[in-house]
Curated annotation (Swiss-Prot):
It comes from Schizosaccharomyces pombe (strain 972 / ATCC 24843) (Fission yeast). Has a function in the folding of beta-tubulin. Microtubule-associated protein that is essential to direct polarized cell growth and to position the nucleus and septum to the center of the cell during mitosis. One of its GO terms (biological process) is protein folding. This is Tubulin-folding cofactor D. It comes from the Eukaryota.
Length: 1105
C-alpha cells in the first residue's frame, strides 16, 4: 500500500522521478544480498512503474543502456530460479515498451556468451516463456560475433546444436517462437550457416502440409528475417530453393484463412524480389526536388532484363493488394513500391497501369451529370491500390503522365462510400486517400504539381468538413496542413487553417455548422461547400441529410443570391423515384426557403407548390410503406421550416400542407408522431378559420380504436398557446373519451393534452367546474404493470394542470371553495407519492398556488408552504414534520392520512419512508384518547375510527387498502390503541377484511391480513381474539401453499401465547403434525372441526355478554 501511494505521488509530481525510482529498484535487484522473495516484490513494483512509460517509451533510453547489460550478465551467474524469473520479466517489459530491436543491441556480445546461452537453454530447468524469450533474443544478438562457430567447442557441432535448440520453438504459439526465428535468421546469415538454411528450406518444403499453423508462421518469419539481414551475394545462392519453398507455401494458402501467413508470404516475396534487383539495376528516373523537370521527363525504354522469378513475385503482390485483411494489403502495397523503386521505368509503368486497371474495373462515368458510379467496385482493391500509390508518392516514384490518371482516382477515393445492405464500406479508402495527399505534397515541390492541385484540394477540404468518421476528418486535416504548409500558393490557405484543427473537426455538428460558415466565407471555397452539401442531401443516412439541411439554412441566410441558383435543379429532383433523394431534397429545399423567408429575401412561395404534392408521389406503387413514411417525414420537416416564419400564404397552399398532416396521421407510424405534432403546431397559427381543429375532432370521433386516435391526442397535447374557439369542445371531447380508453399508452397522451388545454379553457369559459371535476377523476390513476407505476404518467400532467388552474383561479375566482379544496387535496396527496420526481413536483405546485385566496386564509397551510420554500434542499426531517402537520388541517386531513399511511405502510422500505413512519408514530403517541385533552384537533379515537371506516369499506382499491391495513397493524403492534378499542367497529372491520381475503389472490395481501390477525391475538378483548382465530383458520384452506403455511404458523403462535387452551388434545396434536403443503382437500376435515370449536367459543362469549 505504501508503494502504491508513493507511486501515485511520483506520477503527480514529475515523470523524471519515475526513472530515478526505477534506477533504485534495479540497483536493489542486482544486489547479491537481496533474497528471492524481495527481488520478486521489487520486480512487481518495477513493472508498475514501467507501465507509466508506455506513452513515453524514450524515458527508458538512459536506463536501458546502463541496466540491460548488467541485468543480462547477472542472469548468467544467478542460480536461483525465482531471481532468474524476476530479471527476465523486467527485461521482457523493456522489450515490450521500448521494442525488442532497441533492447537487443544492448545485450553484451562476445564469443564466450554463445556457449553459455545455448547451454543455459539446454540445461536450465526454468520453463517460463519469458526466460526462453530473453535468452533466445540475447543469443540472436550474440551470433553476430565474427568468429567461426566450430572454434567454440571441438567436441560439439555448435551450429547444429543451436539449430536444434531454436527449431523446437517453432511449434510454440507464444512470443518465444519469435525470438527463436531471430536466432535462426542470424544463424543462417553467417558465412558458415548457409548450408543450414538450404537444409531447413528443404525440410520445411517436404513436411509443409503436415505442420501446424504455428510452425508455418515460424518458418516464414525466419526466412523473411534472413532475407532482410543477409548480404545480397549470399542470398543469391539460395534464391532457387527459397523461391521453390515459397511457391509451396503459396499453394497452401488456398482455403487458408490465416492472415499472418499471407502477410509473411508478402514479406518473403518482396524481400526475395529486392534481392533479385540490385539497387543500380534501373536508371535514375525518380523525382528529385533539386531537379523539378524530372517530374515531367520520361526516360528511354530500357532493354535490361529482369529475373524470371520477378514476374511471379509481382503477380502475387498484385493479387495480395486486394486481400481481405488490411495489414496484408498494406504489406503488399509496401512490397510493390519497393520493387518498383528498383525496376526500369518501362516495367514500373506496367505495374502502375495494372493497378490503375484494377481500380477502374466496374467503375462507370455518367457523362450527363459528370459523376462516377463506384457502386460495384471492390473496396478492397481500392484500399490496397491507394496505399500503393501513397508509398510511390512518398518515394517520388510517380511521373506527371501517371498523375493525370491517379489524381482523379484519389479525388473519388476522398469521398468513396459504398453501401451493401446495412453495411457501409469506404472509411479505410478515404483515410488512405488522405495519406496519399499527405505523401504527395510532402515529396513533390510546389512548381512541379501546381497545375494539378485545384480539384484535389477542394475534394480534400470537403472531406475535412463533411466526412462521417472522425479519424478520416483528422487525417484529412493533417493532409491539409501539409498542403498549405509546403505550398503557400493556395489562396487564403493560412487563414483557412487558422479555423481548422484537430479539435474543431472532432464534432461533426461543428463541422456542418461553425466551420462550414467560416470556410464558405472564402469565395474560392464556397462553391465546393455548396456542391458537397447538395450531394449529401442524397445520402442514405438521415443524420447526414439533416445536418446538410441545417447547414444550407445557415448559408441561405448569409448567401441567399448564390444559393437561389440551385433551387430549380432541386425542384427537378423531387420527381425522381428514390425515397432517400426525395426526403433529402425536400428538407434541403425547405431549409433554404426557410432561410430566405427569415431574412425577407424576395421569393415566390408558390414556386414550391410541388414540395407539398405528396399525393402524386405516394400513389406510386413502387414505394413501400417505409419509403412513404420517409417521404412524408421530409415534407413534415419542410412544413416546420417554412411555416415557422411570418409569411403570407394562399388558402390552397395552406390546405395542401394540412393534407400532408392528415396523410401522415393515416400512416399510423409511431416514428413520425413528434414530427406530425411539431408540423401542426407551426401550421395551426395560420388557421384563422380554425377549420383544421374541427377536422381533427371529427377524425377522433370517426376512429374505431383508440390506437388510431393516439396521434391526434399527441397533436392536441402540443398545441401552442393561441386563441381557439374550440378549446371547450376539445376539453369536453377528451374528458368523454378518457374513460373509454383501457390502456395507459392511450390515456397518457389525453392527460398531456388536457394539461395544456384546460388552463386555456379556464380563460374562455365560465362553466369550468364540470371539467375540473372530471379532471380530478382522471388524475387518480395508480395503475402498475411490468413497467412500474405507469399511473404516474397521468398523475404528473394532471397535477401540472391543476396547479395552473389554481394559479389562474387566484384572480379569476371561477371555482367553488369545495372544488378548490379538492384540487389542493390532490396536490397534498402527491407530496406522499413514492416517486421522487412527483413529490418534488407536488412541492413546487404548493409553492405556485400559495397565492390563492383560500390558502392565504388558511394560516396552517400557509406556514407549511413557507417552510417548504425555506427548505430548498428538501431536508427529509423537515418535510416529514410538515407532512404530519397536514393532518391537522380539516379540509386536507383525509388526503394527508391516505398519503402518509400508503407511503409508510408498516414502517419498512426506503430511508424516507422509515423516517416518515417514525414521525407519524410519534404524532400518534402524543394524541390523547380524547381530543379535548390533547393539543391536536383530533384524538386517538378519531384516528382509530378513520382506520375502521377505511378497513370496513368494500369499495376501497387494493393499492390503498393493504398499505393502510399494514399501517393499522403496525400501530396496534406498537400499542397505540391498547387502552381502548371500538369492539363493534373492529369486528365489522375484520369481517370485511375476511371477505377480502376470500377473493384476494395476492400472497402479499393475504400475508398482510394474517399479520393483522396475529396482532389482534394480543388484544385485550377476548371476542376480537376469537374472531381473529376463526378467520385465520379459514385461510388454512387457501389454494396458495405459502399462505396456508403462514396461517398454520399464525395459529401456532396463538397456541404459544395460550389462546388455544380450549382445543381438545387430538386437535392440538394434529395442528402440530399436519403437512400444509399437501392438497387442500386432505386437511379439510380438520379445518372444519377447528372452525366449529372456535365458533362455539365465540357464541359462548356473545351469550355471556
Amino acid at each position: 500500500m505504501e508503494e502504491e501511494e508513493s507511486l501515485e505521488g511520483i506520477i503527480s509530481i514529475d515523470e523524471s522521478l519515475i526513472t530515478s525510482r526505477l534506477s533504485q529498484i534495479l540497483d536493489d535487484v542486482l544486489d547479491d544480498r537481496s533474497s528471492s522473495h524481495s527481488v520478486e516484490k521489487l520486480k512487481d513494483v518495477a513493472v508498475k512503474y514501467l507501465q507509466f512509460c508506455q506513452f513515453q517509451p524514450t524515458l527508458l533510453d538512459k536506463l536501458l543502456s546502463k541496466y540491460v547489460p548488467n541485468l543480462a550478465s547477472y542472469l548468467l551467474k544467478v542460480k536461483n530460479i525465482g531471481k532468474c524469473n524476476s530479471i527476465t520479466v523486467i527485461l521482457y517489459q523493456f522489450c515490450k515498451i521500448r521494442g525488442y530491436k532497441a533492447v537487443r543491441v544492448l545485450f553484451p556480445v562476445g564469443v564466450q556468451y554463445i556457449k553459455e546461452l545455448y547451454t543455459l537453454l539446454n540445461e536450465s530447468s526454468n520453463n517460463t516463456w519469458h526466460f526462453h524469450y530473453i535468452v533466445l533474443l540475447w543469443l540472436s544478438q550474440a551470433l553476430n560475433t565474427p568468429f567461426p562457430l566450430n572454434s567454440l567447442d571441438d567436441s560439439l557441432d555448435v551450429k547444429k546444436t543451436i539449430y536444434t535448440i531454436a527449431i523446437k520453438y517453432l511449434e510454440n504459439s507464444g512470443i518465444d517462437k519469435e525470438a527463436s526465428c531471430l536466432v535462426l535468421s542470424r544463424l543462417f546469415s553467417r558465412d558458415d550457416g548457409l548450408d543450414l538454411l538450404l537444409g531447413f528450406l528443404h525440410h520445411c518444403e517436404s513436411s509443409w502440409f503436415k505442420r501446424s499453423i504455428f510452425y508455418k508462421i515460424g518458418c516464414l518469419f525466419s526466412l523473411s528475417s534472413f532475407l532482410k539481414i543477409c548480404p545480397r551475394n549470399d542470398c543469391l545462392q539460395t534464391v532457387d530453393v527459397a523461391f521453390q519453398f515459397l511457391n509451396v507455401a503459396r499453394e497452401d494458402l488456398v482455403g487458408q484463412e490465416n492472415s499472418a501467413l499471407r502477410k509473411l508470404l508478402c514479406k518473403c516475396y518482396t524481400r526475395l524480389g529486392i534481392v533479385l534487383l540490385p539497387v543500380n539495376s534501373s536508371p535514375n528516373w525518380k523525382y528529385s526536388i533539386s531537379n523539378p523537370d524530372s517530374f515531367f521527363q520520361l526516360p528511354d525504354d530500357s532493354n535490361e532484363e529482369v529475373h524470371i522469378y520477378l514476374e511471379v513475385i509481382v503477380d502475387f503482390l498484385l493479387s495480395s493488394v486486394s486481400d481481405i485483411d488490411s495489414f496484408v494489403r498494406w504489406s503488399a502495397a509496401k512490397g510493390l513500391a519497393k520493387i518498383i523503386s528498383r525496376l526500369p521505368w518501362n516495367l514500373a509503368e506496367q505495374v502502375i497501369d495494372a493497378i490503375i486497371e484494377l481500380m477502374t474495373e466496374n467503375m462507370f462515368l455518367n457523362p450527363i451529370e459528370n459523376t462516377v458510379n463506384i457502386s460495384i467496385t471492390s473496396p478492397l482493391v481500392w484500399h490496397g491500390a491507394i496505399l500503393f500509390f501513397a508509398k510511390l508518392a512518398g518515394a517520388g516514384l510517380i511521373k506527371y503522365s501517371k498523375c493525370l490518371h491517379i489524381l482523379p482516382l484519389i479525388e473519388v477515393g476522398l469521398s468513396y462510400e459504398v453501401r451493401y445492405g446495412t453495411r457501409v464500406t469506404g472509411q479505410s479508402i478515404r483515410d488512405a486517400s488522405c495519406y496519399f495527399v499527405w505523401s504527395f505534397y510532402h515529396c513533390y515541390s510546389k512548381s512541379a504539381i501546381e497545375g494539378l492541385q485545384t480539384n484535389l484540394i477542394l475534394c480534400l477540404l470537403q472531406t475535412v468538413l463533411f466526412d462521417n468518421e472522425i479519424n478520416v476528418r483528422r487525417a484529412a486535416t493533417a493532409a491539409l496542413f501539409e498542403v498549405i504548409g509546403r505550398h503557400a500558393s493556395i489562396p487564403d490557405g493560412l487563414s483557412l487553417i487558422s479555423h481548422i484543427n484537430y479539435v474543431s473537426v472532432t464534432d461533426i455538428s461543428n463541422c456542418y455548422g461553425d466551420l462550414c460558415m467560416k470556410v464558405a466565407h472564402f469565395p474560392q471555397f464556397r462553391s465546393c461547400v455548396f456542391q458537397r452539401l447538395f450531394t449529401n442531401l442524397q445520402h442514405w443516412d438521415v443524420k447526414v441529410q439533416q445536418l446538410s439541411a441545417f447547414s444550407l439554412r445557415q448559408l441561405s441566410i448569409k448567401y441567399p443570391k448564390e444559393l437561389s441558383i440551385y433551387l430549380p435543379p432541386i425542384l427537378d429532383y423531387l420527381s425522381v423515384g428514390n425515397a432517400d433523394f426525395i426526403f433529402g431534397y425536400t428538407i434541403g429545399l425547405a431549409s433554404i426557403i426557410g432561410g430566405f423567408l427569415s431574412i425577407s429575401f424576395p421569393f415566390d412561395i408558390n414556386r414550391i407548390h410541388d414540395l407539398l404534392s405528396h399525393k402524386n408521389l405516394l400513389s406510386l406503387k413502387k414505394f413501400s410503406r417505409q419509403q412513404q413514411t420517409k417521404i412524408i417525414l421530409g415534407i413534415l420537416k419542410g412544413i416546420q421550416q417554412i411555416f415557422a416564419n411570418d409569411i403570407r400564404v394562399d388558402r390552397a397552399f395552406f390546405s395542401e400542407a394540412f393534407s400532408v398532416i392528415i396523410a401522415a396521421i393515416d400512416l399510423q407510424e409511431e416514428t413520425i408522431i413528434k414530427d406530425i405534432s411539431d408540423a401542426y403546431s407551426v401550421l395551426v397559427k395560420f388557421d384563422d378559420m380554425e377549420e383544421t381543429l374541427e377536422v381533427l375532432l371529427d377524425y377522433i370521433r370517426k376512429c374505431s380504436t383508440s390506437k388510431e386516435a393516439r396521434i391526434v391526442y399527441i397533436i392536441l397535447q402540443n398545441l401552442p398557446n393561441i386563441s381557439f374557439r374550440y378549446q371547450k369542445k376539445i376539453c369536453k371531447l377528451l374528458l368523454d373519451i378518457y374513460p373509454q380508453l383501457h390502456s395507459i399508452d392511450y390515456q397518457a397522451p389525453v392527460a398531456n393534452a388536457l394539461q395544456n388545454i384546460i388552463p386555456f379553457t379556464y380563460e374562455k369559459t365560465e362553466s369550468i367546474e364540470e371539467f375540473v371535476k372530471e379532471l380530478l377523476q382522471v388524475c387518480s390513476n395508480y395503475l402498475t404493470d411490468t413497467r412500474g407505476d405507469v399511473g404516474s404518467w397521468i398523475r404528473k400532467p394532471a397535477m401540472k394542470a391543476i396547479s395552473s388552474l389554481l394559479v389562474k383561479d387566484s384572480s379569476g375566482k371561477k371555482l367553488s371553495e369545495d372544488i378548490v379544496w379538492c384540487c389542493i387535496s390532490y396536490i397534498i396527496r402527491q407530496t406522499f407519492d413514492k416517486i421522487d420526481s412527483l413529490r418534488g413536483l407536488a412541492y413546487q405546485a404548493l409553492e405556485q398556488i400559495r397565492v390563492h385566496y383560500l390558502i392565504r386564509r388558511c394560516e396552517a397551510l400557509t406556514n407549511i408552504i413557507n417552510r417548504i420554500r425555506n427548505n430548498p434542499n428538501m431536508d427529509g426531517e423537515v418535510l416529514n414534520e410538515l407532512n404530519i402537520s397536514l393532518l391537522e388541517i380539516p379540509n386536507l386531513r383525509l388526503q394527508a392520512f391516505y398519503g402518509i399511511t400508503v407511503f409508510t405502510a408498516d414502517g419498512f422500505g426506503s430511508d424516507l419512508a422509515v423516517k416518515c413512519f417514525e414521525f407519524y408514530l410519534s404524532y400518534v403517541y402524543q394524541l390523547e384518547d380524547s381530543f379535548k385533552k390533547s393539543n391536536s384537533r383530533y384524538g386517538k379515537r378519531d384516528l382509530l375510527q378513520l382506520y375502521i371506516d377505511i378497513l370496513s369499506s368494500e369499495d376501497e382499491i387494493a393499492r390503498f387498502y393493504f398499505p393502510i391495513m399494514k399501517s393499522f397493524t403496525s400501530l396496534l403492534a406498537y400499542g397505540c390503541f391498547t387502552d381502548f378499542q371500538n369492539v363493534k367497529g373492529m369486528s365489522k372491520a375484520i369481517f370485511i377484511v375476511q371477505r377480502r381475503a376470500l377473493t384476494c389472490k395476492s400472497p402479499g395481501g393475504l400475508s398482510a391480513i394474517l399479520e393483522l390477525y396475529r396482532t389482534l391475538f394480543l388484544s385485550k378483548n377476548e371476542l376480537l381474539r376469537h374472531h381473529a382465530l376463526k378467520y385465520t383458520a379459514n385461510l388454512l384452506l387457501n389454494p396458495i401453499e405459502k399462505v396456508r403455511y403462514q396461517a398454520a404458523d399464525t395459529l401456532l403462535y396463538a397456541k404459544s401465547i395460550g389462546l388455544l387452551t380450549f382445543l381438545p388434545n387430538e386437535l392440538n396434536q394434529k395442528l402440530l403434525t399436519l403437512d400444509w403443503f399437501v392438497p387442500v382437500s386432505q386437511n379439510a376435515t380438520f379445518v372444519k372441526q377447528l372452525r366449529n370449536i372456535i365458533q362455539k367459543q365465540i357464541d359462548k362469549l356473545i351469550a355471556d355478554r
